[in-house]
Structure formats: structure tokens, C-alpha cells
């Protein structure tokens, strides 16, 4: 019985022998009986052995499962790198096959997927500068408006103050004039002026005699009585002592309007309380 000897064929890219023009381009099987081990499949399982037919001889070429690839002419440096990568991936482990295939797959750039050209990027710094400028302008306008409002308010307050001061000055001047005129009226009239001799009785019972002008009002008579008696009379009225008696609560009327004659007696009556010392 003959011995089956396995035959290992070296890969064509590792061969250092340069083929000549006289070498045959096809591989010639030897006359010896050989058995070739088939390589593993892509799934990592061994393929079943081929059964030879009974009528086939030992040295027939059909006993061989497959013929080796043709030997390429030229040095290993002339061979393409893609062939080497394919051979190396076929010789690797089955588990590493997907990773190697993914690594060898050409990566498509993102620019090839875009249908339209990429727009230029917006300068963010210019936008920030524009925002800062707008904020600064708004702030300045707000400050200006607030300053104007304060100025208007201050001017209105000053105008109101000046108006109040003017009114106060007018009132003071008027009161001074009235006091001066009243002081002149309190003085007794001269002999050349028309005058009335009146006797005035205070609420406390004190009496005094004095000359008054017919144009003097009843308030002047009351003030002269306060000055003479050194007292203050409030809520007072003046009445005549002759019969029938007449009472005057409106002290703004003059003696001539009230019909008071020369050498009349007038009494000061206080409605509430007594005279204040």
C-alpha cells in the first residue's frame, strides 16, 4: 500500500525564484500518488473529503482537488499591496475577518454626502461686539432719558418753590401794609379830622373813653380795647347800651355803617369763655 504524503505549496508572493522564459506557465502534476488537504471554508469548518471514483488511477490528475495558483513572474516588490492584503486576511482567524474588512473598507468623507457647498462660518466675535455695542447704546440712551427726567423734575420743583416764595413774599408785604394801616388807624384822629367820642366797656367791666374816626371798623375798636386792657378777646361781638340795644357780630363794618353816633357807649360781650389776661 502506498504512503500518502501531504504537499504544502508556498504562496506565490514569497517566492524568490525568478521564472525564465523556458518555464512552463501551467503547473504539471507529478506521477506520484498525492493527497491534497483542502483549506478551511469561510465559516471555519473543514470541507468534506472528495471521494475518488473506483476506476480512476493513482497518478491521474483528477485526484487532485485543485491546482495551485499560477506563479507570477517578477520580484515580490512588483506585486500590488492589495493582493498581499487579501492573502493576509484570508490566512487570518475567522473571528478577525469582520474587523479587518471594516478596516479595509474605504471611508467616505462627509463632504461627498453634502449636495450643496458648505456655507462659511459666521464670525461669533463680530456678533458679540455688535451685541455689546447695542447694549452700550441702549444703556447710554436710558441714562440720558433718566437724566432728562431728573432735570425736568428738578426744574419743576424749583418753579414750584419760586412760586411759593413769591406768594409768601406777597403775603408778608400785604400783612405788613395791613398792620401799618391798622397801626395808623389805632392812633387817635387829630382835631382837624372828623371824629367820634365813644365810651367802651370791656367784658371784665373796665371802661375807657377815646376818639375814633367814623371810617374805623368795629375790629379797630376791639383792638384798642385789647391794647388798653392788655387782654385778648375771642368770639366777641359789640352792642350798643342805649335802648333799644343793637348787637353787631360782623366786626368788619364801620362805625358809620352801624349808625353809631357821637358820645355813644359800646359794650364788648364775649360769647364763649372769658377774657385772656
Curated annotation (Swiss-Prot):
Swiss-Prot/TrEMBL keywords: Cell projection, Cilium, Cilium biogenesis/degradation, Phosphoprotein
Alphabetical GO biological process terms: cilium assembly
Quaternary structure (record): Interacts with CLUAP1; the interaction is direct and mediates interaction with the intraflagellar transport complex B (IFT-B). Interacts with VCP; the interaction is direct.
Record-given protein name: UBX domain-containing protein 10
Species this chain originates from: Mus musculus
One Pfam family here: UBX
Ranges of biased composition (kind: Low complexity): 60-77
Broad class of the protein's primary localization: other
Cellular compartments per GO CC: cilium; intraciliary transport particle B
InterPro entries: Ubiquitin-like_domsf (IPR029071), UBX_dom (IPR001012)
SUPFAM superfamilies per the UniProt record, alphabetical: Ubiquitin-like
Function, as annotated: VCP/p97-binding protein required for ciliogenesis. Acts as a tethering factor that facilitates recruitment of VCP/p97 to the intraflagellar transport complex B (IFT-B) in cilia. UBX domain-containing proteins act as tethering factors for VCP/p97 and may specify substrate specificity of VCP/p97.
Superkingdom of origin organism: Eukaryota
Extent of Basic residues compositional bias: 35-50
Protein family per UniProt: Belongs to the UBXN10 family.
Region (Disordered): 1-102
